């Protein structure tokens, strides 16, 4: 059974997104325990007018969630792009994972480099809410590929 945590910068998700997230997590339940956590604090709020300060605040907030006994993946536009089969292979190799989705300014280079991998979901820019949705869908698809579930045809 996979254990997957997804951390993203932000306050509570809107209901329209939350319903989709919950559906994808529910579909993945037989293969993985997936937890999502939005993080937002005073330091992040105070730093929003300065990109460098904001990225530092995101990194400082995420650091306690880095897994010492798992595989840490930073979502980053300069990260590696994988197709669904390569992503499934990544899931096959690692059963305990943490994904980090930055805020509006992305993540500090030093934080990205401290992770085991930088992953790009697409060359397109997308909001962290859409990125989380795409990630959850690809997690379900990858787990379906591994377990020969008919979702991925």
Curated annotation (Swiss-Prot):
Record-listed E.C. numbers: 2.1.1.177
Positions bound to S-adenosyl-L-methionine: 75, 102, 121-126
One Gene Ontology CC term in the entry: cytoplasm
InterPro entries: Alpha/beta_knot_MTases, RlmH-like, tRNA_m1G_MTases_N
UniProt-listed CDD domains: RlmH-like
Location of the protein in the cell: Cytoplasm
Principal location class: cytoplasm
A family per Pfam: SPOUT_MTase
Enzymatic reactions: pseudouridine(1915) in 23S rRNA + S-adenosyl-L-methionine = N(3)-methylpseudouridine(1915) in 23S rRNA + S-adenosyl-L-homocysteine + H(+)
GO molecular function ontology, one term from the record: rRNA (pseudouridine-N3-)-methyltransferase activity
Alphabetic keyword roster: Cytoplasm, Methyltransferase, rRNA processing, S-adenosyl-L-methionine, Transferase
Domain of life where this protein originates: Bacteria
Enzyme class: transferase
Coiled-coil stretches noted in the UniProt entry, renumbered to this chain: none
Purpose of the protein: Specifically methylates the pseudouridine at position 1915 (m3Psi1915) in 23S rRNA.
Subunit field text: Homodimer.
Family the entry assigns: Belongs to the RNA methyltransferase RlmH family.
Matches recorded under HAMAP family: 23SrRNA_methyltr_H
Protein name from the UniProt record: Ribosomal RNA large subunit methyltransferase H
Taxonomic source organism: Nitratiruptor sp. (strain SB155-2)
Upper classification of the organism: Bacteria, Pseudomonadati, Campylobacterota, Epsilonproteobacteria, Nautiliales
């Amino acid at each position: 059974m996979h254990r997957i945590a997804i951390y993203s910068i932000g306050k509570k998700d809107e209901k329209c997104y939350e319903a989709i997230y919950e559906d994808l997590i529910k579909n993945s339940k037989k293969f993985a325990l997936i937890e999502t956590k939005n993080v937002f604090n005073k330091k992040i709020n105070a730093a929003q007018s300065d990109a460098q300060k904001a990225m530092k605040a995101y990194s400082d907030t995420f650091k306690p969630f880095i897994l010492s006994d798992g595989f840490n993946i930073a979502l980053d536009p300069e990260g590696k792009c994988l197709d669904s089969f390569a992503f499934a292979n990544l899931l096959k190799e690692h059963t305990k994972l943490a994904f980090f989705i930055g805020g509006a300014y992305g993540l500090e280079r030093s934080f990205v480099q401290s992770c085991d991998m930088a992953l790009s979901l697409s060359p397109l820019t997308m909001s962290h809410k859409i990125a989380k949705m795409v990630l959850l869908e690809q997690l379900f698809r990858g787990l379906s590929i591994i377990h020969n579930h008919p979702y991925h045809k």
